[in-house]
Amino acid sequence: SLFQLGKMILQETGKNPAASYGAYGCNCGVLGRGKPKDATDRCCYVHKCCKKKLTGCDPKKDRYSYSWKDKTIVCGENNPCLKELCECDKAVAICLRENLNTYNKKYRYHLKPFCKKADPC
């Protein structure tokens, strides 16, 4: 669910997920689409592609189980789609943490109409 994704992002980056990534670049947030502006935006692009491959669950609403052990996200789910959704969310949270040094405040509220068409997933 979006709540769980936000919690993972907060745990990994220490940033408020809605304020920091809700409208970042061309791909972060609900309306995201377009050629990534930087490494952080690319994390969101890859995340959208990851979620597009899912079948049998709703990435926005369906909840999955995961735990936070030794500062590591551990997905624990028997349902294959929910396990994959958890892994997609885990990957983007880690990617955002790994690219904190390239986070650019000028892309925090980037206007989506200015985004160029992205390559298909």
Curated annotation (Swiss-Prot):
Q: What is its main location?
A: secreted
- Annotated positions for site Hydrophobic membrane-disruption site (MDiS): 111, 114
Q: Which SUPFAM superfamilies match?
A: Phospholipase A2, PLA2
Where is the site labelled Important residue of the cationic membrane-docking site (MDoS)? 105, 108
Q: Does the keyword Ribosomal protein apply?
A: no
Against Pfam families, the record matches this protein to:
Phospholip_A2_1
List the subcellular locations.
Answer: Secreted
GO CC aspect terms = extracellular region
What is the documented function of this protein? Snake venom phospholipase A2 homolog that lacks enzymatic activity. Is myotoxic and displays edema-inducing activities in mouse paw. Also displays cytotoxic activity against some cell lines, and antimicrobial activities against E.coli, C.albicans and Leishmania. A model of myotoxic mechanism has been proposed: an apo Lys49-PLA2 is activated by the entrance of a hydrophobic molecule (e.g. fatty acid) at the hydrophobic channel of the protein leading to a reorientation of a monomer.
Protein name per its UniProtKB record: Basic phospholipase A2 homolog 2
Instruction: Write down the species.
Output: Bothrops brazili
